A protein has these predicted regions:
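Residues lining hydrophobic/aromatic ligand-binding pockets adjacent to catalytic sites
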Residues: 2-215
Length: 215
């Protein structure tokens, strides 16, 4: 069990989160609003989740960008054991997808140089890759979450934490009354209507330094 941090004041709100690849607005809202966010290092890797995919808006609708992974043949693998695969030239494909989807958005060019390295450099482990992305996005969003990594699988009840590790997911998310998506400008809104809870990149590229006000 993760021990309660010694410097955590009584009554501090605690969120348990899984690792995400350019996670959704809802995930970053938790980072911004909770007094302490524990990022789970020891949960099992689950396919078709935000652990290795993000959702963006395109002219054809929502598109999933998925990072290919390598892991052992065991049925359940810890996130810390998941490796990033170089299969399929995915970095180039993901960057081109973002360029195609958001190249005409108000702030794509402003943030492009900060984000391009994630699609050029190689990372060995998915968790480390996602963590670096998270730190960079917090910097660009100008939020300073109290983010700590778990040293073993966390017991949400013992910590008095709100557990979002498997609640925030692309398919059949668990209802979250504390998250009410606030509409913001989107490039393809006239064609598809407002599409809520896409990757944080969608909010950043469309709203720039105003993005934090939607968190």
């Amino acid at each position: 069990m993760v021990n309660q941090p010694a410097d955590m004041a009584a009554g501090t709100s605690v969120a348990l989160l899984s690792s995400t690849y350019f996670g959704p607005v809802q995930w970053y809202q938790k980072l911004n609003r909770y007094g302490l966010c524990l990022l789970e290092r020891h949960d099992h890797f689950v396919k078709q989740t935000y652990r290795n995919r993000c959702l963006i808006a395109t002219t054809a609708g929502t598109q999933a960008l998925t990072v290919p992974t390598e892991h052992s043949e065991e049925a359940k693998c810890s996130m810390t054991d998941i490796r990033v695969s170089d299969h399929g030239n995915w970095r180039h494909l993901h960057w081109n997808a973002l360029l195609s989807a958001y190249g005409e958005s108000p702030f794509f060019e402003y943030y492009a140089d900060d984000l391009r390295p994630f699609f050029e450099q190689q990372w060995e482990h998915l968790f480390d890759f996602n963590l670096a992305i998270t730190y960079k996005l917090c910097e660009l969003l100008d939020i300073r979450p109290n983010l700590q990594l778990t040293d073993c699988y966390a017991d949400a009840e013992a910590l008095g934490a709100d557990d979002f590790r498997d609640a925030i997911r692309p398919k059949k998310p668990i209802p979250d009354p504390s998250f009410v998506p606030t509409p913001y400008y989107q490039v393809y809104q006239q064609k598809h209507g407002f599409q809520p809870n896409l990757s944080i990149l969608d909010l950043l590229f469309n709203e720039g330094n105003e993005a934090v006000f939607y968190l």
